[in-house]
C-alpha cells in the first residue's frame, strides 16, 4: 500500500481536480508500467472479467511500487479471502462488484 500516492489521490479529489486512470484487463505488467510512466493517478486491475491470475496481479503491483499511481483490484464477488489476498498483493484498495449498499459488507 502506497500511503503517499493515496494521500495525493485524496487531495486531488478533495480539491475537485480530475484524476485519470486506466482499467487493466491484460496479463502483461507492461501496461501498468506505461500507466505509471504517463503519470496516471490510478489503475484498476480487473480480476472479475479479465483473465488474470494472482501471478499477473502481483506483476501489476510490482509495476506501481514507488510511484504516485494507486492500484485497485476489482474482485469477482464479495469474498473475504479475495479481499485479503488482493490487499496482500499490495493493492491500495479493492472494488467489490454488484454491491447496492454497505449493509452486505461484513467487517473482517
Predicted features and spans:
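Expand to "…catalyze enediolate/carbanion chemistry for C-C bond making/breaking, isomerization
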Residues: 1-108
Amino acid at each position: 500500500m502506497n500511503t503517499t500516492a493515496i494521500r495525493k489521490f485524496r487531495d486531488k479529489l478533495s480539491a475537485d481536480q480530475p484524476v485519470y486512470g486506466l482499467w487493466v484487463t491484460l496479463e502483461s505488467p507492461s501496461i501498468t508500467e506505461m500507466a505509471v510512466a504517463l503519470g496516471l493517478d490510478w489503475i484498476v486491475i480487473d480480476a472479475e472479467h479479465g483473465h488474470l491470475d494472482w501471478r499477473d496481479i502481483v506483476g501489476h503491483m510490482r509495476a506501481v511500487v514507488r510511484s504516485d499511481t494507486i492500484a485497485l483490484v476489482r474482485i469477482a464477488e464479495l469474498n473475504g479471502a479475495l479481499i485479503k489476498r488482493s490487499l496482500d498483493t499490495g493493492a491500495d484498495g479493492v472494488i467489490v462488484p454488484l454491491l447496492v449498499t454497505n449493509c452486505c459488507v461484513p467487517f473482517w
